[in-house]
Amino acid sequence: MKYNDLRDFIALLEARGLLKRIKQEIDPHLEMTEICDRTLRAGGPALLFENPRGYTIPVLGNLFGTPERVALGMGQESVSALRDVGKLLAFLKEPEPPKGFKDAWEKLPIFKQVLNMAPKVVGKAPSQEVVLEGDAVNLDQLPIQTCWPGDAGPLVTWPLVVTRGPHKERQNLGIYRMQKIGKNRLIMRWLSHRGGALDFREFQLQHPGKPFPVAVALGADPATILGAVTPVPDTLSEYAFAGLLRGDKTEVVQCIGNDLQVPASAEFILEGFIAPGDMAPEGPFGDHTGYYNEVDKFPVFTVERITHRRDPIYHSTYTGRPPDEPAILGVALNEVFVPILQKQFPEIVDFYLPPEGCSYRMAVVTMKKQYPGHAKRVMMGVWSFLRQFMYTKFVIVTDDDVNARDWKDVIWAMTTRMDPARDTVMVDNTPIDYLDFASPVSGLGSKIGFDATNKWPGETQREWGTPIAMEQAVKDRVDAIWESLGIDLPTAY
């Protein structure tokens, strides 16, 4: 399944009945959020608002509102197939030396595929069909959503921010929300450890007092967007990874005003800079936690130039109490994470990030336990192996007889296999999500691990319980006579 740009993907979804065009006039101020939220919670389609009130540019919402659509965006026909994406990333993250000539020959196609997916630079691009500069730059013409009643203003929610540090050849792609505060000014809310913020900091050290070039793509193709939120190895660019997902090289074009390369097929490109010391208070905004975040200062992105396709489409979303679109993305990307973790920790059977836990704040791990204390090693591994889990506050580790995705199973294991004093691990003064107001200090808090595995000799002095299970022969006999008993059971049984 191939698509070249966002419009191809929209056509694919529409052909499958997975996109609904809304012709009625809908206000980007609050109304779109309510419609998208109801649709997402019901597992409904992507929405194309063709007549946003006060604007001439259509708005695409709820694009990744189901795990199945995320899988399609990553070039896969099913959510389960995302495990294959994870296996590829696991291999690229830590490739094993070939065990012999035959093994090297078998791995050669993978390396060739990766090497052949470097982005293709083009001289002419749809994203630069229309060029607006000077006084013509006016962000007020974009139907930017105001998502919640207490929001400080309109918020750009799907920006693909392109930066490059002074000592780096490859660019960084990141998604950082941006508050509109003027016709050509947006607050860039990137946290200090994110790639864009690190590039900015290094640039300031290398070129003190000089403006930092930035480009922002709006409405890039799904593979490129999803590549920016996937744990891509540092040796692989997000553009190359997007090409692997898409099955075709990512086409990029150089910006008109700087040397950054942006997706050639994007609907909009914003070119500009961040001036040293230009900061503004950002927020409050309703966030993926289900609360409004506190106000804090972040750099201001000054837009010098807007380029866009003819008849452009504005891609947007909202964040709120799960489930929201980031939570759905988390459910799908969960399948990508599993093989990556299993590469480092083969004892892991399953790994689950419950969407109710804001996609990353809680993790449940099932494992094949091999020695006393093994669960604690896995806890530490989850917190340290991938930077995506540095903010995970709660890690629950159970044996592989427990279904990590069934709370009834997990709670049973926790209440029957845990002693709170012996089987919890508390780690203080660790990195915590800036948005987590429950932590005593902004960005710094504690983590806790729960060992809900069966305890081995050395971990307990008591005789351990044996789980109850019916004999299989009895179950088979009852299966054979069940229909004749005439007992009607609910389908959920």
UniProtKB/Swiss-Prot annotation:
Q: Where does Mn(2+) bind?
A: 172, 238
Compartments reported by the entry: Cell membrane
Residues engaged in binding prenylated FMN: 175-177, 189-191, 194-195
Q: Where is the active site?
A: 287
Q: Which domain of life is it from?
A: Bacteria
Catalytic activity, as annotated: a 4-hydroxy-3-(all-trans-polyprenyl)benzoate + H(+) = a 2-(all-trans-polyprenyl)phenol + CO2
Keyword Repeat applies: no
Q: Kindly list any coiled-coil regions of this protein.
A: none
A GO molecular function term, named singly, is: metal ion binding
Which coarse location class applies to the principal site listed for this UniProt protein?
membrane
EC class = lyase
What is the cofactor note?
Binds 1 prenylated FMN per subunit.
**One GO cellular component term noted in the UniProt record for this chain:** plasma membrane
Keywords tagged on the record: Cell membrane, Decarboxylase, Flavoprotein, FMN, Lyase, Manganese, Membrane, Metal-binding, Ubiquinone biosynthesis
What is its pathway?
Cofactor biosynthesis; ubiquinone biosynthesis
Coiled coil among the record's keywords? Answer: no
Q: What is its EC number?
A: 4.1.1.98
Q: Which InterPro entries match?
A: UbiD (IPR002830), UbiD-like_C (IPR049381), UbiD-like_N (IPR049383), UbiD_bacteria (IPR023677), UbiD_Rift_dom (IPR048304)
Enumerate the Gene Ontology biological process terms: ubiquinone biosynthetic process
Stated role = Catalyzes the decarboxylation of 3-octaprenyl-4-hydroxy benzoate to 2-octaprenylphenol, an intermediate step in ubiquinone biosynthesis.
Its family remark reads:
Belongs to the UbiD family.
How this chain assembles, per its entry, is: Homohexamer.
- Protein name according to UniProt: 3-octaprenyl-4-hydroxybenzoate carboxy-lyase
Lineage, top ranks? Bacteria, Pseudomonadati, Pseudomonadota, Gammaproteobacteria, Cellvibrionales
* Originating gene: ubiD
